[in-house]
Amino acid sequence: MALTAEKTSGPDLRGPWDFEESPLSQAAKQPLMLGLFLNLQDIHFSSLPTSNSWTFDYNVDVVKRAEELGFEIAFSRTQWLPKGGYDGDSSLDSFIALGAMAAVTNSMLLISTIHVLYGPLHPLHLAKYGATLDHIAKGRWGINIVTGHRAVEHEMFGWQRIDHDKRYDMAGELFDVLHRLWGETENFSYEGKLNPWAISNGWITPKPSFGRPTLVTATGSPAGIDFAARHSDLVFVTSPGGAHIDSALETLPEHVATIKNRAKIYGRQVKTLINPIIVSRDTEKEAIAYADAIEAGKPQAGTRAFAANNYDSDAHAWKGRGDPRHKQGRNLGGNIEIIGSPEQVVEQLVALNKAGIDGVQINFYDFRDDLDYFGKRILPLMKEAGLRV
């Protein structure tokens, strides 16, 4: 493991879990937290018509509607791809876009994704940006920690992809330093051991509202799990069994327990989130027909489409896809697929919760229309089932 800026003196460095009134602590009071997995890229998983748009205005409208419905979290990915990497070559930066939503929302946690090693990003920059966004959002902003898994992305920044486990060691050093910068009451100096940066008399204000911003990690590897256990508050998990809900429910309990037990070793707690796409209509037959229509429009391999491109990745989290030991899903867009009537959707959400999942970051094929349907038909049943209070 990395040699990092472990705290030996000075103030008690706290995080959002240490404050009952923090937005994170309040969100976690829900038996199953609800989040949106926004699409800020012009990516299409099917040619079936949809209202979706990568634009800021569209995504703001969706987030505001989700907030009205009581959703706790908004999140988006970010990627660095060459021309042709996206279906329409248009994308917004998650760090900026989610931060900007602080001014037009009131209660949702806003989680920006940023590749912390590209550049590499200096901790003083990130600490100041984070403290500023935390101030604007009144403690509702957080960061999804990404180290980068695609070779093409590292190459875009001028070097070869860094070894998988070393990336997490480098990120661990960065976030130990960030925590110090956010929490220290005096100037802080540090010489990077794994990263090519140093700090001399670093000082960051304003201090974050609840110790530091909410930290999120999406991972599935042993190195990533250890990093998340040490640093993160929320962990995006993926199904070791692939996208089919049956396989997910078989494999998730052990996987989730491993992550939570690892956090306990460090005297910490984490909550787990997973990313389902929810495809629902009034009857099972209608929901399957909707899923069939989406699947029929999927791009074929070799076409100029994000969903058909096979970028070189060393990520561990999606290895369940294509594993012949497990039932396979339809590859409709989420990490797992929940397809059925509203009643069946809720049954599957209950099963995920029993498997140790604390929240869902939902994809919808049509974010505007399917979110409205979710609010009208599924959310009331979730309340009846005890998933929402």
Regions inferred by a protein language model and the residue ranges of each:
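An alpha-helical appendage that flanks or caps ligand/catalytic pockets
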Residues: A2-L40, E68, D165-P208, S239-K354, ...
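N-terminal beta1-alpha1-beta2 module of alpha/beta enzyme domains
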Residues: A2-V104, K207-P213
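Hydrophobic faces of well-ordered beta-strands that scaffold small-molecule active sites
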Residues: L32-L38, A74-S76, L110-T113, W141-I145, ...
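Conserved, mostly hydrophobic/aromatic
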Residues: L34, A66, G70, M101, ...
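Active-site mouth loops of central-metabolism enzymes
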Residues: I43-D57, I114-L124, Q160, S209-P222, ...
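Glycine-rich, proline-tolerant flexible connector loops at the mouths of alpha/beta enzymes
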Residues: I73-F95, S239-E250, I362-G375
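Alpha-helix-loop-beta-strand connector modules within alpha/beta enzyme cores
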Residues: G85-I111, M170-G172, V256-K264, F374-V389
